Amino acid sequence: MALEEKPDFLCVGGSGTLIFQTVEIFRQLALPAVKRAIELAVSEGFYTHVHSCGPQKELVKIMAEETDLSIIDPLEIPPMGDCNLAELKRLYGHKLTLKGNIHTTDVMLNGTPDDVIDAACQAMLDGGEGGRFVLSTGDQCGRDTPDENIRALLYAVEEYGVYDENGKLPQLSKRKL
């Protein structure tokens, strides 16, 4: 590649990678291009990222088993998605960095700060052990998301999301869920 400055990462795929097509059509039409983009990026030494709203469990499996993708998000929970963070961590957390999956409406928009902290801690319990996890919302936060809920998410990370030298999150045990 002819880049003088390398980006931090390359986003491949897109917001609705699997929403508007079947897995078979994705494999036939999109996966070859996504794989090639990932190969090029990895060969130049930078990370790759897929953001795909909606049902994503099958996409996570494909990306983990058939590509060298670095990170995938937003790992939305039902009803908008189909992801179970603990299951994805167990199956693919050694291969992919998982990013998500705080519910943007039920928790961030309509929840209380305590709801946000509880959801953040649960996500860290489900996905954080051993690293390769980025706590994030399931997608963007709506315009009317209360500032105190955004601050609560930051608080949860600072208070409970600090790894020790063994890749553990020891502060999580202090939070009763």
Language model feature labels by segment:
Residues 1-177:
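Active-site loop segments of alpha/beta catalytic cores
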